[in-house]
Amino acid sequence: MLANLFGKNGLNGSTASLSDSDSGSSSQYNSKPSSQYGSPTSINFKDDTSSILRPISGNILDHMSDDLKSKLFATKDLISDISLAYYDPKSTNSNINISPDSFRLLLTEETGQMVCRNNYRVVLDYVTPKGSYIEQIRPSELKEYIFGSPVRSSDSLEVDKIRVIPNSNILIISRTFHVSSKINRLAICLCLPSYYLPVVMEAWRQVSTWLDNTQASIISIISRLKKPPSTLHLQCDKELSCLLPADARFQFVSEFESIILALQRKIVPCLRSISEIPRLFLYPTTLMKFVELWFKDVFNWMELKDGPRMNFLSTLLAIIIVNFKEELKSSESTRIAIMSGNMVVSNKLINIISGILEPKYKGPLLHTDEDNELSTKLEQLDSIDTVNTSSTEIHMIKKTNSNSSISVSPASTKYQNSNKGWEIPRRRSAHSVASISSGESLAEVIQPSSLKSGSNSLHQLYASLSNNYGTSYGSWFNKRPNISQFMQYSSPSNSNESWDRAASIHRTNSGNSIQQLRAGFGITPQQSPSISEYDEYPWFGTPNSPHVENSATATTSNTTVSSASVPWTTKSITEPNRMYNVHIERDFQRISQTELLDDAFDKICKPGRKLECGLTVTPGNMIHAGVLEIEILNQDCVEKSSELLPRYTSYLRNYNSWFKLQAFPANNESESKVITSMKKDLSVYSYSKALLISLSTRDIKEVTIKKEYKNNTQDTNSFKLIQKTARMFHNGKPQANLSLELNNCILLIESTLKRASELLKPIQSSADTSTAMTQEARQEELLKLFKSIIYFKDTKT
């Protein structure tokens, strides 16, 4: 076997590489043995220290509008604990120049002496990438953290330790164990960047499983090397009864390779994913603003994606409520995967789905004053227009010696000022513009020469199509509008002068961009869709375009264009359809509860503050000091939200098996990736379940995989996997084999949505208020309707 691994020459200067299909990387083994025990191991995987990976979620948030960020994450300023300084290879501070993929693995063993300064030796020391800061810590220092006191311990208990080395930003995870006898202790030590500390316990099942497998491999190696008792006794003086030889890493290359590959391809990616991917915030059901927006998002989806006859969304919500809601909350092997080529549409569906999932946040929400924020924004807008008009103008019309600007009608009561998402870039010397499609991460489009005009700032706009309204059209739209369809809405008297730059509207692989024409409505631009996303993206000016609901007015110096006369839907900026008045202090994984702790402490200990709960004082005695017992099981402390958010996330560029709700690009291997991860779950769990949603084909599948043991035994080597796939929605209609409970839930959702649409009509239109319900009664009934949906299984008889 060794000859096959290292070639015909065995260990004499030859190398061998093994590839893995999952990562596409190769591993090499250097045959030259180490001269001392403390040096790194001979196993040397290919490391490219120059290509340090960027944060996983970097582009996800950059391409997301402020409105969508507020709905998904309850904040616009989502900040990770992992600073970008960690990823800067040019950083001079060695304490922070640690790649997120860096780790160090040590396998150490005691030498059998009771009291000795060097009563251990290093059997394996593997570091990646080479030359990182983790490698600079001496093994003798790590030994102090692993074994502790130099006095040998006769305790045979298995001990797991987690600690951070002071002033080093390095986290140590170690396991100390004995084999069969109490001769020597062995230790597995894993060194990681310290910013993984908050997520280690969340991923402890995966880490503990890797430690168990590593320990089993070491015990297997020792059992294969075990000598007869007489031979072991004769070598005690020379070998000091060591269980592992010094060259064990050369004798058992495949075993040590599997240990390192499992660490490199499972544990480190798991920790990195959990720490770097932002998680959704589940709004409480008591927040009326969220309930209204949730219903509006549902109606937008059903009108623009499902159509009048397709009940795709109601069926999907019913399946999640009946079959997945409780399991997602309690099981780590249940997931919902949305496969789509469009990031914006997928995130809007995730926003709808997250509204019915648990566990919801039960703590207090920090609100900002809407009126003050509105007045501040309007004052800022007025001051910008008066002080520096040229900085806010968007030249839609080319006119000599004239600054034609677009202004928002003063009748507006709200103005969305976005500073995230796609923004107008700064003026550059090169007038080419990069248009990024949702299917292409960095696709630069060479613009025509007509854009290279310094007198017009139109070339500064990104070619994009805003999907900020929660609208998205289905595949039944037959054609995309051309430029002539937009030119017909301009004034005839100004056609020669006002639209002479119409040819300079950006052209991308998705067709003509109309974002320039909508720039005056305060909408955050989004990326333009590619040709492959045509069936999932809204195209305006088509026969089935929805009616215009509002009449926001855009005014130029020569003509006034009303939103009622343009071929696209323009929601008035007066409509309260934003979550900007809610802000949560949080990072990527958890909610900050500092204010809750401070408030609880003030209630108990602040002088002069009335205590709202009972207390009991136990006087001190010779045994203990005085004790103050406080009854905290009151209304303020019951059912508080946990700090850690569930592993639900938004659209990702690649499928991530450690998140239970996500969307990712659709391709030929999308379903196989999910099923493969489900099978891997069965190494820890006995049951795995997934809901596969394809937006391009409008298919919903429920896949379950479970273990079935042979002969009714729990032997891990005598079981088979049973996979069942149920098609729940296909060809635009639910399947006939749905359960009675599912059908009842679908009917409930449809009737509830019908009633909710009637309640929301007075809010969306200027109907007669004499017969309309009061605002309080309407909100109360909307809240009851929403709770009847999400608590269907709890209230059904």
UniProtKB/Swiss-Prot annotation:
InterPro entries the UniProt entry points to: DENN_FNIP1/2, LST4_longin
UniProt GO cellular component terms: FNIP-folliculin RagC/D GAP; vacuolar membrane
GO molecular function, one term: GTPase activator activity
Region of interest (Disordered), ranges: 16-43
cDENN FNIP1/2-type domain mapped to chain residues: 293-683
GO BP term (any one): protein transport
Biased segments, Low complexity type: 16-35
Domain dDENN FNIP1/2-type positions: 690-767
Domain uDENN FNIP1/2-type: 98-285
A Pfam family this chain is assigned to: Longin_2
Keyword annotations: Amino-acid transport, Protein transport, Transport
Its biological purpose: Involved in extracellular amino acid uptake. Required for the protein trafficking from the Golgi to the plasma membrane.
Family of the protein in this entry: Belongs to the LST4 family.
Name assigned to this protein: Protein LST4
Upper taxonomic lineage: Eukaryota, Fungi, Dikarya, Ascomycota, Saccharomycotina
Gene designation per UniProt: LST4
